[in-house]
Amino acid sequence: MSRRAVQDGRRRLYELAVSQGGYFTAAQARAAGYPKQLQYYHARRGNWVREDRGIYRLWEWPRSGYDDLVLWTLWTGGVAVVSHQSAMAVHDISDLMPAKIHLTVPPGFRKKPPPVIVLHRDLLPPQDVEQHEGFRVTTPLRALVDAARVAVDVERLSDGIRDAIRKGLLADRHIEEAIGTLQGEAAELLGQALMEARRSL
């Protein structure tokens, strides 16, 4: 491999890692020109930190509070979107601190999740997804709707709605419109949460 090819591969991998919070997969490294032996070499030398099977982090890249979300998104092959209660935590709406990481994956996703992950299967429309630092996350509105669908308690939902409105992330009319798309318990729960949120605004 020429010196130019090595430099190009290093640049491609670095740019990719930067877009993913300093992380990358073995498959991504291979596509950038790093065969398995070279990957082992960089891991042994400490240039790359092995975070999980087939997932590395650049040693010089600082850790952040979102490392686990980047890591588990990569574990899905990059198809997951951080969602539900985990998305609420990312947007800092309510003081909800979920014990598990909630990810939405396409219906055909078959990988078995570890105990720390809760998978939800759905096809998310592009308008319900935002790019964050190294991972994708559902919008505040979609996060609240999804949380209502899995019956997060009304107090947490109310806190989430109130915080989202105060931060200018959405207006209460958006919640009203979302309630109209829901049925049964989820619609009732979100409606009750909106009424409670309005009392504290």
Please report, for each region that a protein language model flagged, where it lies by residue:
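Short gly/ser-rich loop at a beta-strand->alpha-helix junction or flexible surface loop bordering the NTP-binding
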Residues: 2-201
